[in-house]
Amino acid sequence: MQTLSQSLKQSAISEELASLLTVLANSSKDISQAVRRGALAGVLGVAGTENVQGEDQKKLDVITNDMLKDALAAQGSVKALASEEEDEIVPLAQDGQFLVCFDPLDGSSNIDINSLVGTIFSVLPAPSGDVSEQSFLQPGRKQLAAGYVLYGPSTMLALTTGQGVQLFTLDPVSGDYLLTVDGVQISKDTGEFAINMSNQRFWEPGMQAYIADLIQGKEGPRGKNFNMRWIAAMVGDVHRVLCRGGLFTYPTDTKDPKKPFKLRLMYEANPMAFLVEQAGGKASTGYETILDIAPSEIHQRVAVILGSANEVDACLGYHN
């Protein structure tokens, strides 16, 4: 099997970008170890602090954030980073070529129950001159690379550099990421959807009508049965979509009027949308294509509907 290093050498990307992606992959191996040790290393539970979104930080949120930050600082080609766990951007190499956005541990509420978590990342070109938050506010179409690492029964890396999507599996024997799926393609149609049904009463009328029709199954207007899935970690739900199709959504809701959206654009929605589009799927807020959004700030939140192209189109029909 081809290693990640061999695959990057054969791709059309620059040596500098390949080096950066290698550093991110190597960091994920260390994170995988920390996640697997869990209670044995005393890293479960809350850290006693909140992130910029007002969410309680888990100990592993802080640990994995520092691991990535230290690795990127040492790599030398990253001008600055933005993280879910950092209030502001973190300047690094003054002459760096890249900006990196990441969620160090997506689904961290799953940590204490030993369920799926992951790391999501996005690489953008760095502008010349001084770096600021404005430097990061580029549409998702500008991404040079994006991916996630899923810490599950096996540790897997999903990666795109704009030339399709590859899945790599971490070999615990050699310590290498090995290419296990080349050219991921999401099926156009599906019989699965992923949504947090407990928020149904807070959704917009269009989303309520769409899900109601799915639940009616064969007897309803869709004329077939659908299954619902929900992992409570975007990285896990999107991985399922890449592997066997489906629709994942965290839609607009009125549960907290100050926060109508849940997922962050820069380090959750954009990288996942890039992966999904590169695999033949679609990604939208319900009203605009995610990768075309002009960001207003690094911690901006958006609604997300992504997955099998025909099913996303069907969902969007209820919003229009």
Swiss-Prot record:
Enzyme class: hydrolase
Cofactor: Mg(2+)
Cofactor, how bound (note): Binds 2 magnesium ions per subunit.
Localisation: Cytoplasm
Residues the entry annotates as binding substrate: 106-109, 196, 262
GO cellular component: cytosol
Binding site for Mg(2+) 2: 103, 106, 268
Key words, A-Z: Carbohydrate metabolism, Cytoplasm, Hydrolase, Magnesium, Metal-binding
UniProt subunit comment: Homotetramer.
Protein's name according to its UniProt entry: Fructose-1,6-bisphosphatase class 1
Gene3D superfamilies referenced in this protein's UniProt entry, alphabetically: 3.40.190.80, Fructose-1,6-Bisphosphatase, subunit A, domain 1
Main localization category: cytoplasm
Residues at which Mg(2+) 1 binds: 84, 103, 105
HAMAP family reported for this sequence: FBPase_class1 (MF_01855)
Gene, per the UniProt record: fbp
UniProt similarity note: Belongs to the FBPase class 1 family.
EC numbers: 3.1.3.11
Single GO MF annotation: magnesium ion binding
Pfam family, one: FBPase
A biological-process GO annotation: fructose 6-phosphate metabolic process
